[in-house]
Each structure stands twice: as C-alpha cells, then as structure tokens.
Amino acid sequence: AAGGLLAWARRRPVLAGVLLGLGAATKLYPLLLLGPLFVLCLRTGKLRPFAKTAGATAATWLVVNLPIMLLYPAGWAEFFRLNSDRGADPDSIYNVLRSFVGWPNWAPSTLNLVSLVLFAAACAGIGLVALTAPRRPRLAQLCFLVVAAFLLTNKVWSPQYSLWLVPLAVLAIPHRRALLAWMTVDA
C-alpha cells in the first residue's frame, strides 16, 4: 500500500495500481486507498490517472487471485465466508458499546449491515470535507482518515491493524508530538 502511494506521488499511476493490487491480493485494506485517490482526482478534474490506477489495481488483483479462484474456489472463498459469518470481536467498538449500553448480541448479518452503513457514512463525510475544504487535503491525510474509519466501524479488531495506520500517520500528521502521542495511546 505504501509503495502504491509512493508510485502515485511520483506520477506513475499504473505502477501505483499494480502495487495496490498486489497489496489487496494479500489483505483487502489497500483497496480503501482508491477512495481518497478518486476524491482528489475528482476535485482537480483529472480522472484519467485515477482510471489507470483503478484499472491496474483490478487487473493485478485478478491476475493473482484468478488461478486460485478457479483451482480452489472453496478455499479462496473461505476468507469472505468467515468474515461474513463472524460476530463482533471482543475488542471491537460494537462489543465495547454492548458491554456499556447492554445491547443484545446482533446477528452477523445485522452487524455486517451496521458496519457497512457506518463506514459508508464516514467515507461520505470524509469525501465531502475533501471536496469542499478551502485547501486541497493531502492524499495521506485522507487515506489515514478512511483507514481509521474502516478500523473503527469494522466488527473485527486486531491490534496489528494499527500497523496499517503507521505509514499513513507519519505522512498525514505534521506535528511529531501529536504523532508520538497517538502512537503511545495506541500502543
């Protein structure tokens, strides 16, 4: 994911897409970075580089995944089945709220919908701010916000997910003290 952002910064949209596609083939979160790229390209009116990046991302993801999808369809789909059938992790915001508010355990399908709606609403808010801000936000700032929104609204929380935010935080948070404070609290 970080390599994809670097390639984008160096104005190499196809390479950015290939690197994001490879990242997405191992863990889906690099796909989240396409949203901020789209919003910034929309803001500047330059959608062609985004189209190249998105196309290269999809093509790379397919090249990596298609053989496994065709040869071992049940094994390939297991990740998606597991994630759609699982409930809230003990460390997720939903489980924390449930323990304080006394919410009942939600069925996985309900939790999936709630998580998706909250994440989509957060992304819409981030996109609106990005499109209407007086100064164009930096890509790393938007990526940090989108990935953080995904982690906060997701029903699954693993401590290693914080590592997804580290390179984005280093690029997005300009003040070292604020960055170190965030990293200390997160640890």
Regions found by a protein language model. Name each.
Residues 86-153:
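Aromatic/glycine/proline-enriched transmembrane-helix motif characteristic
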Residues 174-187:
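C-terminal multi-pass transmembrane helix bundles with aromatic-rich, positive-inside signatures
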Residues 14, 18-40, 63, 152-161:
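Transmembrane helices and adjacent periplasmic/lumenal helix-loop junctions
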